[in-house]
């Protein structure tokens, strides 16, 4: 440790935390923030202020700095880049020593990186765009309880995406009618049905009753079709104790999968539930309710790719990822980027998809992306092309809104999916020839034909709010 002397007072952050000569270590946690500084604040000072407040710094010099090796523990702002197309914003790259973070704790990482610093007066807006978790830290986290391959092995389903349906209306059904809808969808050809994010235990349908009627429907559909079926039973609850109580009851009924709202319930609850699922042989479906509060503003908050990485570390076998083509926000290239971060063992830097760093996941299993929100049979070719096999396509209204009923809606989706997969396997450009592929399949499926007629005019063509930053400064790294 270098010899130091204490000098009281306030000094510029950049004198301590701006280190452009620094070369990040393999064990450093790296972060990139999009910053708009207050008028008159130099960019280096704003970047250094973020590095300080998210690591060891405070607003004034303190004598207790002499009791530790501040030069080792501090965050270091080591690079600044302009944001293409925006003269006010810039990217600040910051390196943090791994010892700043508790092992296996996404909670602790986020408390540092997006804690007090987001209320800092020196910046007008601040967004955490990406994180590089070093492999040494990844190995301290539990990750997905099962992963994609183990899920396929348990379900005995290979070579195609999985199909699901969110039961609608999301609120107001009795447990018995809810279970009836589940049964009709599963016997019609779906692999899964799902509780919506805000179904917990309301007066119109208490959780015990829902679990019992739903699992009766699941077992009946499994017996009749000879296929393994499941329903995402939402165990999100007011307290962790109640959450585990619901999970245990789901297990006692023979449920293969449960569900959790990871952002509203919190990462502590989610990591604990993921550990429980790993120990009890249960799949864990993760809903991202509340994510857009954090990630939709392109100038302030946390990008969804960061939330995706944090969820993979915390634990979950499924995660809602957006659809690109449905009713919810999602740029195509950015979506493909975070889908890769969910599934792949190694993802290289690729600025064209918004990925700022290489990310090595080691042997950690992948998370299956769930495409859900305003999709129907006409979207099936695009979904197949965008997501490939290791995904779950979830049609709520696109199943339950079929004029002939739930089973017919499920059957139409299954026929459409298998037609697209077969065409893809034959080498046909599925997205470009989607209309022809579906029309050919509909000749042998009246359910699909009616579904195509019902939703032929339904499109969600709105401009994307959170677009990738593009321009002459964009660096593209081919995967």
From Swiss-Prot:
Give the UniProt keywords, A-Z.
Answer: Calvin cycle, Carbon dioxide fixation, Lyase, Magnesium, Metal-binding, Monooxygenase, Oxidoreductase, Photosynthesis
Q: Which InterPro entries match?
A: RuBisCO, RuBisCo_large_chain_AS, RuBisCO_lsu_C, RuBisCO_lsu_C_sf, RuBisCO_lsu_fd_N, RuBisCO_lsu_N_sf, RuBisCO_lsuI
Write out the catalytic residues in the record: 168, 287
* Cofactor dependency: Mg(2+)
Similarity section: Belongs to the RuBisCO large chain family. Type I subfamily.
A GO BP entry is:
reductive pentose-phosphate cycle
The protein's name is Ribulose bisphosphate carboxylase large chain 2
Other remarks on record? The basic functional RuBisCO is composed of a large chain homodimer in a 'head-to-tail' conformation. In form I RuBisCO this homodimer is arranged in a barrel-like tetramer with the small subunits forming a tetrameric 'cap' on each end of the 'barrel'.
Its UniProt entry gives the catalysed reaction(s) as: 2 (2R)-3-phosphoglycerate + 2 H(+) = D-ribulose 1,5-bisphosphate + CO2 + H2O; D-ribulose 1,5-bisphosphate + O2 = 2-phosphoglycolate + (2R)-3-phosphoglycerate + 2 H(+)
Q: Which GO terms describe its molecular function?
A: magnesium ion binding; monooxygenase activity; ribulose-bisphosphate carboxylase activity
Q: Which residues does the record list as N6-carboxylysine (modified residue)?
A: 194
The membrane-spanning stretches of this chain are none
EC number(s): the record gives 4.1.1.39
What gene name is listed for this protein? Answer: cbbL2
The keyword Transmembrane appears for this protein = no
Which HAMAP family does this chain map to?
RuBisCO_L_type1 (MF_01338)
Protein residues bound to Mg(2+): 194, 196-197
Q: Does the keyword GTP-binding apply?
A: no
Q: Spell out the NCBIfam families in the cross-references.
A: PRK04208.1 (NF003252)
Which Cys-Cys disulfides exist here?
Answer: none
Q: What organism is the protein native to?
A: Bradyrhizobium sp. (strain ORS 278)
């Amino acid at each position: 440790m270098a010899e130091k002397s204490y000098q009281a007072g306030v000094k510029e952050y950049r004198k301590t935390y701006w280190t452009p000569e620094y070369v990040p270590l393999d064990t450093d946690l790296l972060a990139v923030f999009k910053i708009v500084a207050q008028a008159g604040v130099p960019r280096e000072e704003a970047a250094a202020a973020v590095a300080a407040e998210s690591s060891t710094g405070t607003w004034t010099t303190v004598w207790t700095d002499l009791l530790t090796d501040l030069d080792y523990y501090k965050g270091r702002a080591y690079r600044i880049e302009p944001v293409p197309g925006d003269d006010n914003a810039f990217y600040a790259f910051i390196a943090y020593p791994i010892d700043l973070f508790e092992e296996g704790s996404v909670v602790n990482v986020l408390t540092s990186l997006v804690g007090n610093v987001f209320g800092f007066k020196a910046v007008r807006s601040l967004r955490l765009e990406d994180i590089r978790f070093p492999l040494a830290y990844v190995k301290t986290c539990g990750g997905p309880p099962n992963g994609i391959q183990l899920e396929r092995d348990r379900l005995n389903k290979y070579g195609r995406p999985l199909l699901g349906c969110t039961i609608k209306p999301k609120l107001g059904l009795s447990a018995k009618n809810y279970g009836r809808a589940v049964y009709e969808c599963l016997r019609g050809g779906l692999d899964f049905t799902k509780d919506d994010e805000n179904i917990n235990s309301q007066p119109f349908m208490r959780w015990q009753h829902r679990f019992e009627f739903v699992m009766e429907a699941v077992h009946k559909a499994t017996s009749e079709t000879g296929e393994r079926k499941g329903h995402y039973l939402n165990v999100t609850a007011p307290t962790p104790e109640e959450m585990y109580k619901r999970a245990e009851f789901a297990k006692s009924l023979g449920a293969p999968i449960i569900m959790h709202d990871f952002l509203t319930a919190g990462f502590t609850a989610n990591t604990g539930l993921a550990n429980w699922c790993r120990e009890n042989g249960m799949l864990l479906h993760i809903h991202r309710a509340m994510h857009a509060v954090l990630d939709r503003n392109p100038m302030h908050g946390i990008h969804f790719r960061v939330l995706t990485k944090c969820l993979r570390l915390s634990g979950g076998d499924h995660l809602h990822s957006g659809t690109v083509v449905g009713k919810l926000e999602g740029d195509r290239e950015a979506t493909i980027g975070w889908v890769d971060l969910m599934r792949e063992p190694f993802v290289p830097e690729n600025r064209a998809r918004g990925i700022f760093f290489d990310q090595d996941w080691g042997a950690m299993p992948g998370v299956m992306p769930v495409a859900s929100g305003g999709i129907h049979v006409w979207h099936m070719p695009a979904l197949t092309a965008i997501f490939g096999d290791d995904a779950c396509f979830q049609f709520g209204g696109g199943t339950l809104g079929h004029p002939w009923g739930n089973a017919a809606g499920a059957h139409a989706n299954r026929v459409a999916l298998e037609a697209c997969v077969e065409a893809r396997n034959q080498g046909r450009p599925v997205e470009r020839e989607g209309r022809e592929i579906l029309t050919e399949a509909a000749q042998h499926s009246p359910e699909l034909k009616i579904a195509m007629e019902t939703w032929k005019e339904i499109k969600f063509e709105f401009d994307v709010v959170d677009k990738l930053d593009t321009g002459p400064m964009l660096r593209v790294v081919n995967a």
